[in-house]
């Protein structure tokens, strides 16, 4: 639950995310997606109150009212509730990595991207040699050539910077990767590439669970499960194929109809441009 003073902004969002699974949290603007994302990532603005639980164990990530154990390389922290703890205070082995839609906050403008990924890997407990090798591996995993490692973010395209953000998140070796509107401001080709990449990342060894935050229902189709938010509450959930093809709640129905119209309009516009 997220509250501001006496007002409840988000309530009853219970999730159970298995390793390497893909879940989409969808909703229109103001539905509560960003607040839920911030609560999970430990980046809620000051002044907001949060209650509930967020736990990590070998079987995945859980949020809601339950509890489970989380572990790191140095021991066990039985039943640690991460919700309400800022990201910097969360114990190792319980990392939740956030891929923000805003590259300017995710990437340092003056440090070469390969160095940034290496530093993130070192912060996860890797030696310098290991971290440098992993930086190369992570660049490769997100479809970037290691020759780009020496470039600062400003010398990369928007799609390349988003890929670097994904590599940076992987370097944290998280149990959960939250991708917050990762295709915002990308062109159609870059958008499709990022969605394909997100799908492929969950097939990596020791892949994290993926939580995709989006208002874009076609993007949600890459996920196995969909959770629909409206007014800070869950109104519908289930397998993506079922929810997107046969929505039950009126709000979800309206969202699917609007998405279908946008898809048709986009196809017509593309056809007109090609003519």
Language-model features and meaning:
Residues 61-97, 115, 123, 243-247:
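ABC ATPase NBD coupling module
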Residues 130-147:
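Conserved ABC ATPase "signature" region
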Residues 152-156, 160:
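Conserved ABC ATPase signature
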Residues 173:
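Conserved catalytic motifs of ABC-family nucleotide-binding domains
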Residues 221-228:
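Conserved catalytic segment of ABC-fold P-loop ATPases
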């Amino acid at each position: 639950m997220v509250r501001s003073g006496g007002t409840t902004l988000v309530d009853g969002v219970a999730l159970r995310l298995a390793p390497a699974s893909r879940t989409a949290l969808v909703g229109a603007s103001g539905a509560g997606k960003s607040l839920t994302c911030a609560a999970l990532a430990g980046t809620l603005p000051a002044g907001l109150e949060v209650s509930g639980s967020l736990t990590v164990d070998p079987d995945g990530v859980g949020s809601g009212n339950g509890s489970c154990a989380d572990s790191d390389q140095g021991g066990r922290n039985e039943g640690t509730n991460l919700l309400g703890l800022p990201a910097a205070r969360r114990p190792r082995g319980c990392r939740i990595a956030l891929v923000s839609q805003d590259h300017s906050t995710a990437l340092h403008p003056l440090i070469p991207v390969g160095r940034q990924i290496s530093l993130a890997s070192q912060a996860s407990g890797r030696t310098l040699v290991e971290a440098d090798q992993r930086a190369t591996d992570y660049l490769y995993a997100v479809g970037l050539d290691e020759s780009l490692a020496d470039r600062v973010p400003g010398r990369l395209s928007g799609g390349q910077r988003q890929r670097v953000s994904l590599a940076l998140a992987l370097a944290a070796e998280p149990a959960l990767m939250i991708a917050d509107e990762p295709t915002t401001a990308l062109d159609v080709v870059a958008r499709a590439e990022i969605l394909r990449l997100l799908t492929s990342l969950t097939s990596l060894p020791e892949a994290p669970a993926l939580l995709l935050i989006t208002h874009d229902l076609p993007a949600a189709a890459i996920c196995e499960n969909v959770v629909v938010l409206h007014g800070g509450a869950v109104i519908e959930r289930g397998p993506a194929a079922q929810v997107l093809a046969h929505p039950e709640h009126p709000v979800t129905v309206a969202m699917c109809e609007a998405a279908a119209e946008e898809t048709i309009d986009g196809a017509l516009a593309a056809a007109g441009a090609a003519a």
